[in-house]
């Protein structure tokens, strides 16, 4: 039987340099950053099904990391000294984007699947949008492209964004006219590894819930803490380090059987609502109530969603 290989990738991203002049608050900046991510750090491993690593790659993107107007839009921009230390020690290499993509393409060809935790972001947004940016950057139409992006950002902050990708949930990574099957590790973990009572109890005991309190956290960090029993583990949020822990998560999932191409938009929903779980496990109800109240304390509206949360609190208080 042919040995299978898996490429596990992670990216760290900034966004377009004019985002800050268009966004009126942090949420609008976040919305632009999610819609228009520019990769500045990319790393990947190639491993077998046991998690043995065959190859590792890690690069800083010259056109984004070394351009302050771009890198300063990154959520983790304070990590610049850490990156420069890594660069000085030759622990990470800086290359132009096109050179990195040539290496990535060759490694994708040598793998049976390309994988990422939240693959929809890395393979459907971050890499494709960076491709468009770099292509425009080295063209004679860059200013026209930037003007279109500025108008698009204005639409995003005004709550309207018609940039649709009909192939967003097709488990295929398209890169320079080549196609590679995707396995979304977030969805895989939610299906095979963390949708169980032990994990949900772990989340409730430690307050590991989503911001609204309605769902259990299911990030790579939280999943790895539970699966590796490394409960104090903190995700690095640098590309190769994160790809390494995601390689271990994949190996755990492969112990439960072979994988098939898959991608998910909201895999955390696999675990169900926290309030449904605490109906059967009422000792945790106060954890959920407190989290929802904390979320509501930051809101000042009378929306349907707010009223829904208030009704959930009322329901939980009667248990």
Where are these regions (language model features)?
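Short, surface-exposed amphipathic charged segments that create phosphate/polyanion-binding patches used
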Residues: 74-76, 193-205, 218-219
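Conserved DEDDh/DEDDy metal-dependent 3′-5′ exonuclease domain
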Residues: 77-198
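Charged, low-complexity interaction regions
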Residues: 296-307
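C-terminal or late-domain output modules
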Residues: 64, 71-94, 258-284, 288
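Acidic, Mg2+-coordinating catalytic module of metal-dependent nucleases/exonucleases
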Residues: 113-120, 124-125, 202-284, 291
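Conserved non-catalytic scaffold segment of RNase H-like nuclease domains
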Residues: 2-7, 11-133
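Ser/Thr-centric signal marking residues that sit
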Residues: 11-14, 185, 246
């Amino acid at each position: 039987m042919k040995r299978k290989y898996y490429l596990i990738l992670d990216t760290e991203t900034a966004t377009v340099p004019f985002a800050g002049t268009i966004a009126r608050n942090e949420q609008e900046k976040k919305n632009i950053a999610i819609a228009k991510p520019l990769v500045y750090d990319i790393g990947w491993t190639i491993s077998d099904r046991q998690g043995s690593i065959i190859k590792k790659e890690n690069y800083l993107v010259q056109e984004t990391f070394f351009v302050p107007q771009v890198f300063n839009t990154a959520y983790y921009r304070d990590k610049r000294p850490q990156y420069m230390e890594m660069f000085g020690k030759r622990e990470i290499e800086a290359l132009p984007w096109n050179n990195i993509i040539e290496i990535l393409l060759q490694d994708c060809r040598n793998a049976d699947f390309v994988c990422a935790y939240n693959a929809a972001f890395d393979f459907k947004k971050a890499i494709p949008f960076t491709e468009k940016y770099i292509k425009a950057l080295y063209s004679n139409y860059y200013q026209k492209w930037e003007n279109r992006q500025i108008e698009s950002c204005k639409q995003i902050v005004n709550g309207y964004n018609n940039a649709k990708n009909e192939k967003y949930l097709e488990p295929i990574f398209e890169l320079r006219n080549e196609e590679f099957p995707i396995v979304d590790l977030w969805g895989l973990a939610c299906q095979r590894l963390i949708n169980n009572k032990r994990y949900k109890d772990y989340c409730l005991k430690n307050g590991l819930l989503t911001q609204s309190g309605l769902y259990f956290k299911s990030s790579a960090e939280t999943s790895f803490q539970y699966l590796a029993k490394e409960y104090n583990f903190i995700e690095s949020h640098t590309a190769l380090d994160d790809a390494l822990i995601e390689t271990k998560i994949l190996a755990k999932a492969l112990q439960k059987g072979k994988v098939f191409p898959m991608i998910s938009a909201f895999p955390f929903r696999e675990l169900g609502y926290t309030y449904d779980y605490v109906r059967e496990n009422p000792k945790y109800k106060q954890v959920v109530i407190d989290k929802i109240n904390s979320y509501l304390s930051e809101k000042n509206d009378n929306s349907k969603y707010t009223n829904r949360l208030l009704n959930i609190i009322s329901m939980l208080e009667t248990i």
